[in-house]
Regions:
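Bacterial Sec-dependent N-terminal signal peptides
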Residues: 1-33
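Solvent-exposed, low-complexity segments and loops of surface/extracellular structural proteins
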Residues: 31-37, 41-809
Length: 809
């Protein structure tokens, strides 16, 4: 038969199909297709057989070192063997319509080298392939659906690396000696887990290792029964390695662990451990900063902690006992007590059986309370004798109903100089929110001090903290701390109080947020109160010390003075100084000094005072004088020998008496009538009576009737009411020089009697008034023009004089 017409035998047909299926794998393995075919099904071609034999002989005697290769899995059933890297990525389906996983449960991959790797991409779901001798398995979940790699059918694996873009990722069937790595998980809701076999966790000394790199997901669970939302079990010693990028683990779940080792070269946070029997937490191998929350383990167990060389924080929900050992290691380390809402009061401080400190190399003690939902807050008492290495104390109050009390006893000078207090964002409460009692170990000196920084913007519960109250007291015997410095931080206001008999030498306050308030719940009896570096709006009351100096800052401040010799500097902005009869000084011996500073400042006098240059000469740099004497008072403006810049007088309560303002300068051009003016007589006169004096009268009376107003030196009077409710009635107005009366605003102005002595009045203009106006100009001897508001419903009642007058409106 002609060779060209020869039909292929059955064996040849089988070989052709087999070759097509395995061609790629065969080429990757370095075996010729011809040799593979012949080895599979033989040949009746002597020439080929001879050639193949020769080729095989040459290959067998070669001394070339095998080179690791790369193998790609397909969309079919794969059985691959070789040394190198196996790629099990997403591939097209047989029909070419969908992307599917190339690694399936029926696939077998055998690594023949010593460092074989398989890279697996999973689109969700569980797979259980057979992986033999592949040392490193990289398993990545590419979608939102959780994916699990089951290694029950596999062996020879030393490392499993888990990663995910979204969905939970895990591995099951993990045997003894397998390190689990978790990396590149940036979704905060993603979990990772390593479910170990029952054989792997036999005994009481099972160890497991988890390495993280850039994990910022939720849980990492390790051990038998571990799943995305289930803690593992059966592991007694768990080692956590952290490197590369920052990692933050919400919960490290291995419930049976008694020893935790942390080796972190990068910043690492573990917010919770599911294990409740931890006796050893060893982070001495860490060089990066660690934050580890062991919750109740310190209180429940004899607990030993060793920190690393970074800035470490150990978090517990209780204090420590004499059988514990807390060593922060190198770096600036913190022991943070964050109690549960159901906890009782906390006592911090204990010594070992040998009366030695059980805490060392910890620089900051941090204490935080939560709202316990009851009538009493959780209080802290700490004996700093038992924490000699601590150089700073931090507190945070969180109860919404009752003040959290912090008793800081036996502090040394360094500790007393580095105290901080914050709030948990609980908003305004009816009582004091935090009370801090400061106690020094040695307060025998004459210049003992304490410094506390208060932050009013911490908001763990997402509610902005504002106007929280902090009461700072000296609990040292005989109140021996002479000076207190309070630094205000944050963006919210604060209410600051101190015990009346404490910090007698000085109180210094700095900081604060602009446009926020700094108020006080107590009088300040410190010899010096320095708030010159405060940006907030200050309101406080001075004490009755014989001598006191007060400085305020750049906010709009209101200071209430008291008896004694006071030196006051209100700094920048528009400030108000309120002082009574005793406050402004009534004797030559008084050495007060009231300096309004920059801005438009107000001196508010609430009592009667001696009208003399000796008394009023203590005032400088005020622009407004508010008279509220509750009785008859005369003030000669020229007696303000150091304050010629007054521009406004506010007349308030004179108890039905008379307020007389004499010798007003030309710059004093505004007279405000407050509602206390009812039943009073007000007299305003100039130091120099020029031909063009102008006075603005601003009414804020809320319906008041004044008995009389005398303004004899004013040619032009511009009257205005602040609001429709500011209705003013003046029984008698006397104004000898008055030529023009302009009336505006929504409130009524009713001048009951004819304006006395007003022979020169020629213009009454009420066109800008929307309230009722009543003016009787009977005494004018010149032709007048009177204008009402024609567009308003307000009543304009006018009486002209003896000349030819024009009335419109």
């Amino acid at each position: 038969m002609d060779a060209s017409n020869k039909q292929p035998t059955l064996a040849e047909k089988f070989a052709a199909v087999w070759e097509k299926k395995n061609a790629r794998a065969a080429r990757a393995g370095g075996v010729s297709l011809m040799a593979l075919s012949l080895a599979a099904c033989g040949s009746d071609d002597d020439t080929v057989a001879t050639t193949t034999a020769a080729t095989t002989t040459a290959t067998d005697t070669s001394t070339t070192t095998p080179v690791a290769s790369s193998f790609d899995l397909t969309n079919g059933t794969d059985t691959l063997s070789g040394a190198g890297t196996f790629n099990a990525g997403m591939v097209w389906s047989p029909g070419g319509t969908d992307r599917i996983e190339s690694l399936q449960s029926e696939d077998t991959v055998t690594g023949t080298g010593t460092a074989d790797i398989i890279n697996i991409t999973n689109n969700g779901g569980a797979i259980a392939p057979k992986l033999i001798g592949v040392e490193t398995v990289n398993f990545n979940v590419a979608g939102a659906t959780a994916g699990t790699l089951n290694l029950s059918n596999s062996s020879g694996i030393t490392t499993v690396a888990l990663s995910s873009t979204d969905g939970d990722v895990g591995v099951s069937g993990v045997g003894t000696g397998v390190e689990v790595k978790v990396a590149g998980i940036a979704d905060a809701s993603t979990n990772a887990f390593a479910n170990m076999t029952a054989t792997a966790v036999l005994g009481s000394a099972t160890a497991a290792t988890v390495s993280v790199d850039g994990f910022v997901g939720t849980n990492i669970n390790v051990g038998s029964s571990a799943a995305a939302g289930v803690s593992g079990a059966g592991v007694e010693t768990l080692t956590l390695n952290s490197s590369g990028e920052v990692s933050s683990i919400a919960s490290l779940g291995s419930s049976g662990a008694t020893t935790i080792n942390v080796n972190a070269s990068q910043t690492t946070t573990v917010s919770a451990f599911t294990a409740t029997g931890i006796t050893t937490l060893d982070a001495s191998g860490s060089t990066g900063s660690t934050t580890l929350n062991v919750a109740a383990n310190v209180n429940a167990n004899d607990f030993a902690y060793t920190g690393g060389s970074g800035t470490d924080t150990l978090i517990a929900n209780s204090g420590f006992t004499g059988t514990d050992n807390l060593n922060g290691g190198d770096g600036a380390d913190t022991f943070s007590i964050r109690v549960l809402s159901t906890s009782g009061d906390v006592t911090v401080g204990a010594l070992s059986a040998a009366s030695a400190a059980v805490v060392s190399n910890i620089e900051t003690l941090d204490m935080r309370s939560l709202d316990n939902g009851g009538a009493n807050a959780i209080d802290f008492t700490v004996d700093m004798d038992h924490m000699p290495g601590v150089t700073a104390l931090s507190m945070r109050a969180g109860d919404t109903g009752t003040a959290t009390v912090f008793n800081l006893n036996d502090m040394n000078a360094t500790q007393a100089g580095a105290i901080s207090l914050g709030f948990n964002g609980t908003g305004n409460t009816t009582g004091t929110d935090a009370t801090v009692n400061l106690g020094l170990k040695d307060a025998s000196g004459t210049a003992d001090s304490a410094t506390i920084t208060i932050t009013a913007s911490i908001d763990d519960d997402a509610t902005p903290a504002s106007n929280q109250t902090a009461l700072i007291q000296d609990s040292t015997t005989n109140n021996a701390i002479e000076s207190l410095t309070v630094n205000l931080a944050g963006t919210k206001g604060i209410i600051l109080s101190t015990e009346a008999a404490t910090f007698g030498t000085s109180l210094t306050v700095t900081g604060g947020a602009a446009d926020q308030s700094l108020t006080t719940g107590t009088t300040f009896n410190n010899t010096t109160v320095d708030m010159s570096a405060v940006a907030s709006n200050i309101t406080f009351t001075m004490g009755t010390l014989a001598t006191q100096t007060v400085k305020t800052g750049s906010g709009a401040d209101t200071i209430n003075a008291a008896a004694g010799s006071k030196t006051i500097d209100l700094g920048a902005n528009d400030d108000t100084l309120v002082t009574g009869t005793a406050g402004i000084g009534n004797a030559v011996a008084n050495v007060d000094s009231f300096n309004g500073g920059d801005g438009a400042d107000t001196l508010h006098v609430t009592g009667t005072f001696t009208d003399s240059g000796t008394v009023l000469g203590v005032v400088s740099n005020f622009e407004t004088l508010r008279l509220d004497p509750a009785g008859t008072q005369a003030v000669t403006m020229s007696n303000f020998i150091n304050n010629a810049g007054f521009t406004k007088i506010i007349v308030d309560d004179a108890g039905g008496g008379t307020i007389t303002v004499n010798n007003a300068s030309s710059s004093l051009n505004t007279l405000r009538l407050e509602d206390g003016v009812a039943g009073e007589t007000v007299v305003f006169g100039r130091l120099v009576d020029t031909a063009d004096n102008t006075l603005a009268i601003d009414s804020r009376t809320a319906t008041a009737t004044a008995t009389a107003l005398t303004i004899n030196n004013e040619e032009i009077v511009n009257y205005s009411s602040n609001a429709a409710a500011d209705d003013t009635t003046i029984t008698t107005v006397t104004s000898a020089d008055l030529t023009t009366l302009n009336i505006s605003g929504a409130g009524d102005l009713l001048i009951t009697n004819a304006i006395a002595s007003s022979t020169k009045l020629k213009t009454v203009d009420a066109s800008a008034s929307t309230g009722g106006v009543e003016v009787h100009a009977n005494n004018s001897a010149v032709a007048m023009t009177a204008t009402g508001n024609s567009a308003s419903a307000g009543v304009f009642e006018f009486t002209g004089g003896s000349a030819a007058d024009t009335i419109t409106g």
